[in-house]
Amino acid sequence: MDIVILEPADWRVFKAIRLEALRLEPRAFGSTYQFEAEQTAAFFRQRLTNNTVFALWEPGQSGKSGAARGVLGIGPFKGPQEKHKAFLWGMYIQADLRGSGLGSELLQTALDVAAKQVEQVLLTVTASNTAALSFYRRAGFEEYGKEPRALKVADSGYEAEILMVKVLT
């Protein structure tokens, strides 16, 4: 398995893994499958242009191009007094790879790249996602707050989000 940075030309790969994540883990993300499934190629190209998106890449067999098996994005803050920060978003690893260490490798690769440009990385994780909370704590992220009712999940209520940060330098 390789870790690659997706380019705007890879928008179809990104869209496929992103839609899978939204379909299988709807309570974990601020967006929805329905919303992103309706978006154009330009939407996904823009996400790849404005962020650094890393993918766990499984090379294909017999000349096939391969597939993304996991993904995460890191986007910079834009304000002049916030350029020392980035936001980690959209982390998803296919179920059969969870617990294999590949998610940790993906995250660490992203943090190593981010450390060359920013001093700290922030993220949010739904309070009910205890596996993700444990994963980020093991990676050195610390909680600094909680936003109640952060996500309103259609027909199933609200999700609180835990705010986390990792200082890189």
Q: Where does each model-flagged region fall?
A:
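Acetyl-CoA-dependent GNAT
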Residues: P8-A16, E20-D96, L107-V113, V167-T169
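Residues at secondary-structure transition points
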Residues: A9, Q39, G79, K83, ...
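Structured loop/turn residues at beta-strand edges in well-structured enzyme cores
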Residues: A67, K116, E159
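Conserved acyl-CoA
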Residues: E105-Q120, E142
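Conserved glycine-rich acetyl-CoA-binding loop
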Residues: Q81, G90, Q94-Q108, T126-S134, ...
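C-terminal "cap" of GNAT-fold acetyltransferases
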Residues: E119-T130, R138-T169
